[in-house]
Amino acid sequence: MKTISFSPPDITEAEIKEVAEALRSGWITTGPRTKKLEKEIANYCGTNKVVCLNSATASLELNLRVLGIGPGDEVITSAYTYTASASVIDHIGAKIVLIDTAAGSYEMDYEKLESVITERTKAIIPVDLAGIPCNYSKIYEIINYKKHLFKPKNKIQKAIGRVVVCADAAHAFGACQNGKKVGNIADFTSFSFHAVKNFTTAEGGASTWKDIAGIDNEELYHEYQLLSLHGQSKDALAKTQLGAWEYDIKGTYYKCNMTDIMAAIGIVQFKRYPELLKRRKAIITKYDEGLAECNVDVLKHYTKEYVSSGHLYLVRLLEKDSAYRNAFITKMAERGIATNVHYKPLPMHSN
């Protein structure tokens, strides 16, 4: 029986060849291929800079850290997401503020968002679930309305002057809203390049950010480099330059840089990505047609306002309980079709 895996990586001989060349080059950690991929993604998203890291989780956490968020602060996110959206808030010592979804929606309840913003609120992490951009215009409307409560703690917060939008766009690389790419809509954006994602580097992620008046992009990029490489003032590539061995440790930070082996996969994936997105759209169209007469609710991936990356095809079985859903998943598995549940709401977990 033919089986259909849930989300296998789409790897061709071209990716394998590029990885082999990286291995033969003698440079396998952060280096020229990582820098090349960063430039490709920045051009694609329409941003000045991109920092490639080893995961979206690292990206989410470093976004909060460059903003100086920590103990005594509050960060808002959705209750309907993967744990990383919230766990990074705990990592930095801030308080997690969860908002439930609106009725009949997978997005957070924006009416509740307005009510939970306090003087301690420093950021919101909205989630582009399944590759569909969330309602950014509504989010900006609300945080601008409540900006009088905002008390900045560092120069970036002060320059922005309101609650900062740090999008969890782990699913949404390649998505657009009102003609603008995800990655250049929120103040800061995190992408995932994990093995199950549309665009993969096996493991990996990236941070992007919009231009901020009064903030130097090169300085901000360097801050990410420090945070992702033990606070070391120069990466390994920079230290190979003539007479440039000496470096400084600027802080006791972290180790979450992307390697050139990972970037090698991404460089080829990037060339193939338009076709990969086109293929996903064709499959989603088939699903939409096949389920049109069924008693289910599905997300709309393509509208006049947005274009999804098509990462997940979520189906809500109407008027059915979890026992029916679980039996349905089993029946699909018996037919060789893998499915999954995205997501168990965070408050339903043991911790």
What are these regions (language model features)?
Residues 63-119, 123-125, 332:
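Conserved PLP-anchoring active-site segment centered on the Schiff-base-forming lysine
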Residues 27-74, 88-90, 98-99, 147-153, ...:
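Phosphate-binding glycine-rich loop
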Residues 104-201, 211-213:
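Active-site phosphate-binding strand-loop segment of PLP-dependent enzymes
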